[in-house]
Every structure is written in structure tokens, then in C-alpha cells.
Amino acid sequence: GFLNQFQFVRSAGSYTATGLDFLINKKFNRISSWLTYSYADNTYAFNDLVPSAFPNNLDIRHSIAFASSFTHERFEASAGLKWHTGKPFTKPVETDPITGNTINYEAPNSSRLEDYMRVDLSVKYNFPLSTRINAQIGASVWNLLDNNNIIDQYYRINDSNEVQVFQQKALGI
């Protein structure tokens, strides 16, 4: 749903998504790597809303992912990187944020969150416990650089009749 001026509006619409995906995958002996790039343009269309067309809530224009893994006998290590442009959101009008009891928003999805970036690492060791039982032990670190990735942002009016910002963040270390 919407977290802006259309939050409580019931309307039927559609969306169009166009884009390109590229994948490069290469294996070198014990190392396997891949790299992807995606470009996407996702746009909503609602005949009875103004404006009638605006970016989709998940309109992430550019996305890059890279991963590589190394295997040697019973040992495996992997690393990955994920980056993408920020998704759209709607800010209140800076000069006049509240009209009556409602937030006065800018055009829908006209702002973008900061870019998202994450680096992950993992290691795993496989070993036999007996002739019939195999075991694995491993560890992984998600968001190794502990980036402060904001994945959503919305607004509410607090008890003091001020606009309050809420941010949803991805996991850190």
C-alpha cells in the first residue's frame, strides 16, 4: 500500500515495468563468481488519482550484485556485495507540512531513499561424524561494513501536532 496522500484512497490501477538484466558467470578451478546488473523502470497508473502516473513503490532503477565462492576440499568461503539505488518515497511539503489534521505531501514517490549497499561473508567446513553421518559447521556475517541501510521511510502526526519521521532500517552487524 501507500504511505502518503493515497494511504486511505481505494482505487484500481496498473503498473508497467520495463528493464534489462545482465549476468556474467565464470568458474575458475575452485573459484566461482557471478556479477549481475539490472535496470528497471516501474511506474504506477491510476486514472482517478492526481497525478495519474508516478513511480512504483519498488522502483529500484539500478541494481548490482557480485558474489564469489572458493572451495577447497571440505572448506568453502563466500563473499557477496549488493548495491542498488534507493527506492521512492513521499515527503511532506517542507514549507506547509500539515493541513488541518493531515500531512500535506509532495508529489507521490517524488523522493528517493539513500542508496543501499551490503557486503556479506560466510565460511563453512564439512566433516564426517561417522561413516553414515556428515556434518557442517559455518559462520556468516551479513552487512559486514555495518552500513545504515534505510529501506523505508514514512510520516505520522504526533501528539504535539508535528510531523514525525519513521525509518525502517535493514539489519546491521
Give the role of each language-model region.
Residues 2-92:
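Gram-negative outer-membrane beta-barrel transporters
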Residues 83-99, 117-118, 124-173:
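C-terminal beta-signal and adjacent terminal beta-strands/loops
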Residues 63-69, 103-106, 128:
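Generic detector of contiguous secondary-structure segments
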Residues 2-9, 46-51, 101-109, 157-162:
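Extracytoplasmic loops and strand-loop junctions of Gram-negative outer membrane beta-barrel proteins
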Residues 26, 59, 70, 112-114, ...:
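Surface-exposed coil/turn segments at beta-strand junctions on protein surfaces, enriched
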Residues 14-18, 60-64, 115-119, 133, ...:
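Residues that define the transmembrane beta-barrel architecture of outer-membrane proteins
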Residues 106-113, 124:
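Short, glycine/charged-rich beta-strand-loop motifs at protein surfaces that mediate ligand recognition
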Residues 16, 36, 115, 138-141:
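A subset of signal/propeptide-processing and intrinsically disordered low-complexity segments
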